[in-house]
Amino acid sequence: QRQMCIRDSTQGWLHCDIPGTDASGVVKSMMDELIDEFRNCDMPNRVHITTSCCQINCGGQGDIAINVQHTKPPKINHDLVANVCERPSVVARCPVAAIRPAMVNGKASLEVDEKKCICCGACFPPCPPMQINDPEHTKLAIWVGGNHSNARSKPTFQKLVASGIPNNPPRWPEATAIVKRILKEYKEGARDWERINDWIDRIGWPRFFEVTGLPFTKYHIDNWRGARSSLNASTHIRF
């Protein structure tokens, strides 16, 4: 049966202590907008949509994924760092070595090298005084083409297709509109039993951005040179 599945990977504002958005709310909003697709089950193949309210803990591969995107480095409350945070652990947590110990106003604290910071939010859970959530600068991003399955093609990682989307509760209309647009083109253009990643592989990324009307920018290009030699994106046996 060609059905749709939407799930949130976390409890968002209801339960989690570090959310940048409310994943449960995003799911409810999109389910309301896509209710006919759930009733009719007439997509070319199963569509797995996921939402996450931070970039580091919850989440997973999905045909379409709506994730938080922080756009500013954390703001540090230096008065609280020494009493709340285990500074060596916070320094070690940063994936790009952008955090280092510092003395501020005679108190042990931390500082962030904003040129290195990638705004991932990994420092916030172990050190709440490093506040990164912001009503203006915390956005949403949409990724597509993630697939765990090894049935028709090799497993694939998600690719960014839209970023800087307003984090606009309670209905998130901007994010919902983009997801509906992607699903519309997939429904009309994909062949029977093609997953979204298979459809994109067949038509190509330039054609995908053309039919969906999404702007393509330099930030969509994955230029990390180490990806090919260090990331095993397939479960196929290689010699």
Regions found by a protein language model. Give the residues of each.
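Short, hydrophobic beta-strand segments
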Residues: 7-20, 162
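Short, small-residue-biased leader/transition segments that mark boundaries at the very start
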Residues: 2-6
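A glycine-rich phosphate-binding loop feature that marks nucleotide/adenosyl-phosphate handling sites
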Residues: 10, 48-55, 196-209
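Ferredoxin-like iron-sulfur electron-transfer modules
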Residues: 34, 39, 43-46, 64-125, ...
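A hydrophobic, small-residue-rich beta->alpha segment in the mid-to-C-terminal subdomain
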Residues: 147-190
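Long C-terminal interaction/binding lobes of large macromolecular proteins
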Residues: 209-211, 215-239
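Short acidic, glycine/serine/threonine-rich loops at helix termini
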Residues: 59-66, 153-156
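Short glycine/threonine-rich loop-to-helix capping motif typified by GTGT followed
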Residues: 15-24, 58-63, 119-121, 200-219
